[in-house]
Curated annotation (Swiss-Prot):
Residues in RWD domain copies: 11-137
Location(s), subcellular: Cytoplasm; Nucleus
Stated name of the protein: E3 ubiquitin-protein ligase RNF14
Class of enzymatic activity (EC top level): transferase
UniProt modified residues of type Phosphoserine: S349
Biological process, per Gene Ontology: positive regulation of DNA-templated transcription; protein K6-linked ubiquitination; protein-RNA covalent cross-linking repair; regulation of androgen receptor signaling pathway; regulation of canonical Wnt signaling pathway; regulation of DNA-templated transcription; rescue of stalled ribosome; ubiquitin-dependent protein catabolic process
Gene name, Swiss-Prot/TrEMBL: Rnf14
EC numbers, comma separated: 2.3.2.31
Organism: Mus musculus
Length: 485
């Protein structure tokens, strides 16, 4: 490495660290490289939707979601010794909501930008392009259709390229032929398992970012007329009127102490919005909330005995249940639940007991009379009651259901997705298969290096439904079959 290249690399990394905060840029510790997260600015009222003929697509089709934020594009890069004088940075570009074909188009444009900047540093130009021009370059408009690319197909392509490179050398004729046939760049990674998980991740990320933005803004409370940060405020879900938590706390406490539990409306005159039980619970003391909950339930039952509340924390709207039945369907979120246990409706099967309620159920059963015991056995099932009596506590849960981060030891549970994991404690990347730490500059090299024990196992042991893949991938398979003929 020449002194000029080393100085240019150090200056560029230092400049990026000063321009972007820690959430957007992180320098690798062991190599000249790092990771950038590109958060795109979306137009107002940007909508996403799903369509298709697979079972998973049909379950989500017909719904449009208005969002303000999308998960970031992640650019992992490593600077070679002769950068920027001769060679470009090696990189991978990953994203959850762009298909492999779209990510490949971005990778190709990054290559073109390097050609334009050859001999000069290019990382800032790459980041600016991804942040400001991605939507325009890919012709993405609202409503935007979410798509999935075939990870199995991508893995087969990576295997073919690796074998071709091994036989003829990197850049050989066979490798060049493979590159010409493929439309998906091996540097493009759509790190999401399925459309259903993709939609949920987008909605969760959008809610988290909206909360973060709300908490960082200043709002004028219409009660005390003081400006306060959003983290010290709360807004009513229906009308979006904002008040400071201190004023709402006093307002709620006075109403609850007076028994006016149905009068927790928005303080704005003539506004019909009502605080949710979750909002009330957040502000008032536990004993006062217990009084509120009891009075609210009692007043509701006095007026209409067949009304229950949706158990979802984000909804909690009143729901009518059918006479003589135990099933109720929320008209707002369409959640079907059992009116006894407040969990997903389970038909004639006994109510399930969560781990948190096992101890309470055991104590209640031991202190109950014979009639109450028979009722509990009928509601939860005798087997569940017996299990609650036998189990004193849920020990060894972490050992059976989680693995420890190789860096900080934080217990991590894998729900779904690929085998490239991120520790929620120290943000270290690691492999779920071998539990080895991964490079921040290029965490996917562990799965693409033919010498690695986890080569081509990014989605190992993940149940992937082949019906969800794009028609363009199926057409590629048909073309390959025709070529074989």
């Amino acid at each position: 490495m020449s002194a000029e290249d080393l100085e240019a690399q150090e200056d560029e990394l230092l400049a990026l660290a000063s321009i972007y905060d820690a959430d957007e840029f992180r320098k690798a510790e062991s190599v000249q490289g790092g990771e950038t997260r590109i958060y795109l600015d979306l137009p107002q009222n940007f909508k996403i939707f799903v369509s298709g003929n697979s079972n998973e697509s049909l379950q989500n089709s017909g719904f449009e979601y208005t969002i303000c934020f999308l998960p970031p594009l992640v650019l992992n890069f490593e600077l070679p010794p002769d950068y920027p004088s001769s060679s470009p940075p090696s990189f991978t570009l990953s994203g959850k909501w762009l298909s492999p074909t779209q990510l490949s188009a971005l990778c190709k444009h990054l290559d073109n930008l390097w050609e334009e900047h050859r001999g000069r540093v290019v990382l800032f130009a790459w980041m600016q392009f991804l942040k400001e021009e991605t939507l325009t370059y890919l012709n993405i408009v609202s409503p935007f259709e979410l798509k999935m690319g075939s990870q199995k197909k991508v893995q087969r392509r990576a295997t073919a390229q690796a074998s071709s490179s091994t036989e003829l050398g990197v850049g050989g004729a066979a490798a060049a032929d493979v590159d010409q046939e493929e439309t998906v760049d091996e540097r493009a990674v759509q790190d999401v398992e399925s459309l259903s998980s993709l939609i949920q991740e987008i909605l969760d990320f959008n809610q988290a970012r909206q909360t973060k933005c709300f908490n960082s803004k200043l709002f004028l409370c219409s009660i005390c007329f003081c400006e306060k940060l959003g983290s010290d405020c709360m807004y009513f879900l229906e009308c979006k009127h904002v008040y400071c938590k201190a004023c709402l706390k006093d307002y709620f406490e006075i109403q609850i102490k007076d028994g006016q539990v149905k009068c927790l409306n928005c303080p704005e005159p003539q506004c019909p919005s009502v605080a949710t039980p979750g909002q009330v619970k957040e502000l008032v003391e536990a004993d006062l909330f217990a009084r509120y909950d009891r009075l609210l339930l009692q007043s509701t039952l006095d007026l209409m005995a067949d009304v229950v509340y949706c158990p979802r924390p984000c909804c909690q709207l009143p729901v009518m249940q059918e006479p003589g039945g135990t099933m109720a369907i929320c008209s707002s979120c369409n959640f079907a639940f059992c009116t006894l246990c407040r969990l997903t409706y389970h038909g004639l099967s006994p109510c399930k007991v969560t781990a948190e309620k096992l101890i309470d159920l055991r104590n209640e059963y031991l202190q109950a009379d014979e009639a109450t015991k028979r009722f509990l056995e009928q509601r939860y099932g005798k087997r569940v009651i017996q299990k609650a009596l036998e189990e004193m506590e849920s020990k060894d849960w972490l050992e059976k259901n989680s693995k420890s981060c190789p860096c900080c030891g934080t217990p991590i549970q894998k729900l779904d997705g690929c085998n490239k994991m991120t520790c929620t404690g120290c943000m270290q990347y690691f492999c779920w298969i071998c539990m080895g730490s991964l490079s921040r500059a290029n965490p996917y090299r562990h799965f693409t290096d033919s010498e690695s024990p986890c080569f081509n196992r990014l989605f190992h042991a993940v149940d992937i439904n082949g019906d969800m893949w794009e028609d363009e991938i199926e057409e590629d398979d048909d073309d390959e079959d025709d070529d074989d003929d």
